[in-house]
Amino acid sequence: MAMEITFLGTSSMVPTKERGQSGILLDCGKEKILFDCGESMQRQLRIAGIAPPKITRVFISHDHGDHIFGLPGLLENIAKNSAEKKIEIYGTVDFGKKLKQIFKSFEIGHKIDINFTAIEKNGVFLDTGDLQFGAHFLNHGVPCLGYYVREKDRICIDKVKMKKLKLPSGPIIAKLKSKKDVTFEGKKIKWKDVTFVKEGKKVSVVLDTAICSAAV
């Protein structure tokens, strides 16, 4: 699985001429994940050629303004231009309270189906089959999360051994990759003998924090 990272904002409390407030997009193909949503996020997405309705999940590190001020506009955009009109948002309990205020102030709640998940402990909190999502609390004075996205390890066929045994593509290969032994031309072939484990990629996003063990 290809993973592409786009830095949308790398400034801090005050944006500069060259840099916007916090925002990172991780493109995993079917999943397009936004980490933090600083001021002018819609503009940054447009510059990067990323359509807001394509975003599937938003992960907020903490509830300081430079990490969330772009959220109302982004949600309005998705509500108006997304066919599904829904999005998954994750963050701290404190951020969840501010998100409710955003719903009320901008009357967004009835326009789009927003599912908010509060992260209350360290570790994996979501498994989609292909990806695992986890978080750890950092050291920032207020509840603040660092996130990671891990691609699952995959069983792959050793093509050299496949060619040597003259194994055909198709059901036989599928069985071997699903950890099942097969019989081919009267010979039993053990899946462990012709496969290897390809370790999945892992991307960690650690934003505002002092040095702490959770950030490593």
Predicted regions and their residues:
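A gly/proline- and charged-residue-enriched helix-loop-helix capping module
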Residues: 94-105, 114-121
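Conserved beta-strand hairpin/beta-sheet module of binuclear metal-dependent hydrolase folds
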Residues: 1-48, 84-86, 147-149, 196-206
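Active-site-proximal loop/helix segment associated with metal-binding centers of metalloenzymes
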Residues: 131-205, 209-216
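Active-site metal-binding loops of divalent metal-dependent hydrolases
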Residues: 10-11, 39-40, 63, 94, ...
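Local beta-strand/beta-hairpin segments that build beta-sheet-rich folds
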Residues: 8, 122-127
